[in-house]
From Swiss-Prot:
Sorted UniProt keywords: Apoptosis, Host membrane, Membrane, Viral envelope protein, Viral matrix protein, Virion
Other facts: Most abundant protein in the virion.
Keyword Membrane appears in the UniProt entry: yes
Subunit text: Homomultimer. Interacts with nucleoprotein and with the cytoplasmic domain of glycoprotein.
Cysteines paired by S-S bonds: none
Residues of the signal peptide: none
Protein name from the UniProt record: Matrix protein
Organismal lineage: Viruses, Riboviria, Orthornavirae, Negarnaviricota, Haploviricotina
One Gene Ontology CC term in the entry: viral envelope
Bilayer topology: Peripheral membrane protein
Domain of life: Viruses
Cellular compartments annotated: Virion membrane; Host endomembrane system
Length: 177
């Protein structure tokens, strides 16, 4: 059984997402900026009802297409010298997915708000400006020649719905046959 894959172009127009922290739960301690955990925590909060898009973004981050930098910055809330983790998004990507994504452009201002992760307090803020458009299968070959590096492959957790492990243990189902 094979799932039908739809092709999409996703653009990130001036998308900026950051997490700032001043200090840890104990005086003099700095909270670690655990980028992937902050990103996942933020995704589940921002995209509560759009789990398929959260899945794609989480996989883009874990595979290095959305990267992050750590720096000292002047935070509007925490003041100068705050430790900041800022996520850098590509300008555009082309992906096949088994999910049906809602097309259009969405802009969302992430007002500064408190995020607590592992007893550390972070201030999350930013701007998400994301466009999603569908691509006809007949156009994929031409676009791939012109915009090759922007084709990043499937970012679904399990695009074909293949059961690779038994729910009861970690043994591979195929190996047990």
């Amino acid at each position: 059984m094979s799932a039908k894959l739809n092709w999409y172009r996703i653009t990130f127009n001036d998308t900026v997402w950051r997490f700032d922290t001043a200090r840890g739960p104990k005086d003099g301690e700095t909270c670690p900026l655990i980028a992937s955990e902050l990103f996942s925590s933020g995704l589940s909060e921002v995209f509560k009802s759009v789990t398929s898009f959260s899945e794609i973004l989480r996989n883009m981050e874990s595979r290095g297409y959305i990267t992050n930098i750590t720096l000292r910055a002047d935070s509007d809330i925490l003041g100068p010298g705050a430790l900041r983790c800022e996520f850098l998004f590509p300008s555009e990507v082309f992906i096949p997915t088994s999910h049906t994504l809602k097309m259009g452009r969405s802009s969302l201002i992430l007002e500064p708000h408190l995020v607590v992760l592992k007893e550390c307090k972070y201030i999350s803020s930013g701007k998400l400006d994301i466009g999603i458009s569908s691509i006809e299968a007949t156009s994929v070959a031409v676009l791939r020649r012109v915009k090759g590096p922007a084709f990043i492959g499937c970012m679904d957790d399990n695009p074909f719905g293949v059961l690779t492990k038994k729910p009861s243990d970690e043994k591979n189902v195929l190996a047990s046959k």
